[in-house]
C-alpha cells in the first residue's frame, strides 16, 4: 500500500534535503580514521569503518552526523577518485593478486588481476601500472583494479628510473627513426668553417647544440656569432620524427642518463656540433658595446660551421683563474676564450644594471655505479665558463625575441609577469612591515619589479625574498611576445637548444621564414600546453628519481652522529623542510624534534618562522646543522633532527 505513495516519496525527499552534507577531500591518517577537509578552516572526522569506503585524496560528498555535540562524516557520493591510473607493488600469486599503490598515505592492498591482453605472469614484488575499476561509493562491494602494464621485477637495480617513468607515463628510450639526408630548404648557407668556433660543455655532453665565435672590431666593440645546431635541416615539419619530438617536447634529463627528444643518431651525432666535423647551423651575429649593450643591427642567417675545439667548463674556468695544468691547444682557441670572457663580463654588467641576474646555485650531480648505486653526489658550482655560455645564450635568445616580435609578431616565448595583480596590496603591506616601501601599482611593471628585486638582493639574507615568493606568478610558454620579469627582460624566446626543446625547433622554423622573407603561420596554442605539461612531468620525474637516490645514499647515515649543514627552505604546521647544502637532499624535521612541549612551539608557514616560548629560534634561509634520524625507503623520505 506504500508503494508509489507520493506522500512517502515527498517525505523521503524532504528528509534527504534537510540532512546536512559537505563536499571535500578525504585525508587519511596512519591510525585508520580520517578527515573530510572542506577548506583550510573546516574539517570533519571520518570514523575507521567509514574510511573503508574511501581512499586518501578522494573528493566526495558526505552526510554530516552530530552525536553528543561531535560531528562526523559518512561518505555518500564520489565526485572525483584520487586513484585512476597508478603504479604499485604486486602482492600474492597469480590466482590471488593485490597491489599496494606507491604512495606515502596509501597502505592498503587493492585486489587486482591482469587486464586482458597483458601477457606477463605477475608475482610477489613485481612493479606494475594499474587502473582502478571498482569503488565502494560507485555501488561496488570493494575496491578493485586491473594490472595494465608490467614495469619490472622487485630487485631490479634500476627500479627508481623505470617506476618513475611509468608513473608519469613518460618514454623510456630514444625515439626510433633515421634522417637520411638534409632537406632542401631554399636557404643560402654562409661558409664559416674557417672560423675558430668552440663549444663549451660538460665533459660527458654528447648533444652539443651551441658553438661560439667572437672577434674584436676596429672600433673596439666585440662581435659575437652564436651558431646553433640545425635539426630542422633534417626534420620536416609534420614528419614522423617531428611529430614524435612534438609529443616529447623536451629531452628528459634524469640522474644518470637522459631520454632524448630526437633519435640519438641526430641528437648526439648528425646535429651535434662535434669538434672538427662540418655541420649545418642557424646563426645569429650581434655587436656588443663596451657597456654590454647589444646593437640594433642583429643578423640571423643559415651557415655551415666546423667547431675547432670541444672545451670543458672546468678546464676553461681553471685556465681563466690561472689554476691547473690545462692549456688551450693553440693561440687561436686561447684568443677565443679571452674574447668570450670579455663579452661575458660586459653582458653580465649590463644585466646587473638593466635587467636581473639570478643568484648562483650549485648543480648537484649523482655519480652512479654500474648497478645504479649512488657512489657520490657532487655539488658543481656555476663557474666563469658556465657564465660565458649563459650570457651568450641569454643574449642570443634576447635577439631572437626582438626579431620574431618585430618581423612576425609571434613566436614561442617564455613569459613571466612577475607578481599576480591580486597579490599586489598584500605584497606591499608585507614589505612595509620589513621596512621596504613599494608602490603596489609600480611593482606590477617590469621596471618596478626589477627595482624591488635589486633591493631584495641587497638584503643581508634571503629571508624576505623567500617570504614574497608565494606572491609571484609562474613562468608560462606563450605564442604572444611578452616580458620575462624573472630575467628582467622585455621579451625572451629560446632557440639555442633545438636538439632538446621542441619550442626551439619551432622558433628555428620561424627564424628561417624571416631569413627567407616568407610568410609563416602562427604556432597553434595547443603546442604551448603540451610543452608546459611535459616540462611539469619531466621536472616531477627528475625530483622523484632524485628522492629515491638520496634515500639510498643517506640510508647508512640514519641514526648516526654525522652532521650536515642544512638550509631551512619551508616551515609548516608539522615542522620544517631543509635542504642539505653539500648534496641537495631535502629532509623533513618534525615539530616534536624542534621542541618537546607542543604548546610552547609555534611553526608559522605564513611568517616562515619557528617560535619557542615566543622567541624566533628558526627561520627560512637559516643554515643549521642536522643529523639524519631516519630514512623511510618505502616513501623515499628523509627525517632529520637539529644536531645537538
Curated annotation (Swiss-Prot):
Molecular function GO terms recorded: exoribonuclease II activity; RNA binding
Keyword RNA-binding: yes
GO biological process: mRNA catabolic process
Domain RNB residue range list: 189-516
Keyword annotations of the record: Cytoplasm, Exonuclease, Hydrolase, Nuclease, RNA-binding
EC number of the protein: 3.1.13.1
Keyword Cytoplasm listed: yes
GO cellular component: cytosol
Catalysed reaction, written as an equation: Exonucleolytic cleavage in the 3'- to 5'-direction to yield nucleoside 5'-phosphates
Family: Belongs to the RNR ribonuclease family. RNase II subfamily.
Function, as annotated: Involved in mRNA degradation. Hydrolyzes single-stranded polyribonucleotides processively in the 3' to 5' direction.
Protein name, UniProt field: Exoribonuclease 2
Amino acid at each position: 500500500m506504500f508503494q508509489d505513495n507520493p506522500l512517502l516519496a515527498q517525505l523521503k525527499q524532504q528528509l534527504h534535503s534537510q540532512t546536512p552534507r559537505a563536499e571535500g577531500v578525504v585525508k587519511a591518517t596512519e591510525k585508520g580514521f580520517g578527515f573530510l577537509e572542506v577548506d583550510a578552516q573546516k574539517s570533519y572526522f571520518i570514523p575507521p569503518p567509514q574510511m573503508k569506503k574511501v581512499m586518501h585524496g578522494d573528493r566526495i560528498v558526505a552526510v554530516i552526523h552530530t552525536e553528543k555535540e561531535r560531528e562526523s562524516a559518512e561518505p555518500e557520493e564520489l565526485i572525483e577518485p584520487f586513484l585512476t591510473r597508478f603504479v604499485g607493488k604486486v602482492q600474492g600469486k597469480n590466482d590471488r593478486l593485490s597491489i599496494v599503490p606507491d604512495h606515502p598515505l596509501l597502505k592498503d592492498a587493492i585486489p587486482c588481476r591482469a587486464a586482458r591482453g597483458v601477457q606477463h605472469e605477475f608475482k610477489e614484488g613485481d612493479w606494475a601500472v594499474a587502473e582502478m575499476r571498482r569503488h565502494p561509493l560507485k555501488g561496488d562491494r570493494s575496491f578493485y583494479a586491473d594490472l595494465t602494464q608490467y614495469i619490472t621485477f622487485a630487485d631490479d637495480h634500476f627500479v627508481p628510473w623505470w617506476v618513475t617513468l611509468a608513473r608519469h607515463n613518460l618514454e623510456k628510450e630514444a625515439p626510433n627513426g633515421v634522417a637520411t639526408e638534409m632537406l632542401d630548404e631554399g636557404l643560402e648557407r654562409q661558409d664559416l668553417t674557417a672560423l675558430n668556433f668552440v663549444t663549451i660543455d660538460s665533459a660527458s655532453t654528447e648533444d652539443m647544440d651551441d658553438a661560439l665565435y667572437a672577434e674584436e672590431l676596429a672600433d673596439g666593440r666585440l662581435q659575437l656569432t652564436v651558431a646553433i645546431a640545425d635539426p630542422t635541416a633534417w626534420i620536416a615539419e609534420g614528419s614522423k620524427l617531428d611529430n614524435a619530438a612534438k609529443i616529447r617536447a623536451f629531452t628528459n634529463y634524469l640522474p644518470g642518463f637522459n631520454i632524448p627528444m630526437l633519435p640519438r643518431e641526430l641528437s648526439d651525432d648528425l646535429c651535434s656540433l662535434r669538434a672538427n666535423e662540418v655541420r649545418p647551423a642557424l646563426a645569429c651575429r650581434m655587436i656588443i658595446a663596451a657597456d654590454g649593450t647589444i646593437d640594433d643591427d642583429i643578423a640571423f642567417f643559415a651557415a655551415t660551421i666546423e667547431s675547432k675545439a670541444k672545451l670543458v667548463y672546468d678546464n676553461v674556468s681553471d685556465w681563466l683563474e690561472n689554476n691547473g695544468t690545462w692549456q688551450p691547444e693553440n693561440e687561436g682557441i686561447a684568443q677565443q676564450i679571452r674574447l668570450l670572457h670579455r663579452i661575458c663580463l660586459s653582458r653580465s654588467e649590463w644585466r646587473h644594471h638593466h635587467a636581473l641576474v639570478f643568484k648562483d646555485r650549485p648543480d648537484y650531480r649523482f655519480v652512479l655505479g654500474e648497478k645504479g648505486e649512488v657512489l657520490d653526489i657532487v655539488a658543481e658550482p656555476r663557474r666563469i665558463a658556465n657564465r660565458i655560455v649563459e650570457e651568450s645564450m641569454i643574449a642570443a635568445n634576447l635577439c631572437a625575441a626582438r626579431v620574431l616580435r618585430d618581423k612576425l609578431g609571434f613566436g614561442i616565448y617564455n613569459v613571466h609577469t612577475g607578481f599576480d595583480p591580486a597579490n599586489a596590496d598584500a605584497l606591499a603591506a608585507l614589505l612595509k612591515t620589513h621596512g621596504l616601501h613599494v608602490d603596489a601599482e609600480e611593482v606590477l611593471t617590469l621596471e618596478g619589479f626589477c627595482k624591488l628585486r635589486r633591493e631584495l638582493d641587497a638584503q643581508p639574507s634571503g629571508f624576505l625574498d623567500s617570504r614574497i615568493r608565494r606572491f609571484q606568478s609562474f613562468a608560462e610558454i606563450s605564442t604572444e611576445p611578452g616580458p620575462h620579469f624573472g630575467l628582467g627582460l622585455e621579451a625572451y624566446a629560446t632557440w639555442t637548444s633545438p636538439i632538446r626543446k621542441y619550442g626551439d625547433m619551432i622558433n628555428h622554423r620561424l627564424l628561417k621564414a624571416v631569413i627567407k622573407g616568407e610568410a609563416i603561420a602562427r604556432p597553434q596554442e595547443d603546442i604551448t600546453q603540451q610543452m608546459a605539461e611535459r616540462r611539469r612531468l619531466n621536472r616531477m620525474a627528475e625530483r622523484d628519481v632524485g628522492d629515491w637516490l638520496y634515500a639510498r645514499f643517506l640510508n647508512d647515515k640514519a641514526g648516526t652522529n654525522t652532521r650536515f649543514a642544512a638550509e631551512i627552505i619551508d616551515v609548516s604546521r608539522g615542522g620544517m623542510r631543509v635542504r642539505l647544502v653539500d648534496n641537495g637532499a631535502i629532509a623533513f624535521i618534525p615539530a616534536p624534534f624542534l621542541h618537546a612541549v607542543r604548546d610552547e612551539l609555534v611553526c608559522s608557514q605564513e611568517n616562515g618562522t619557528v617560535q619557542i616560548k615566543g622567541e624566533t629560534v628558526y627561520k627560512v634561509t637559516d643554515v643549521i646543522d642536522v643529523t639524519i634520524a631516519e630514512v623511510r625507503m618505502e616513501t623515499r623520505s628523509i627525517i632529520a633532527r637539529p644536531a645537538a
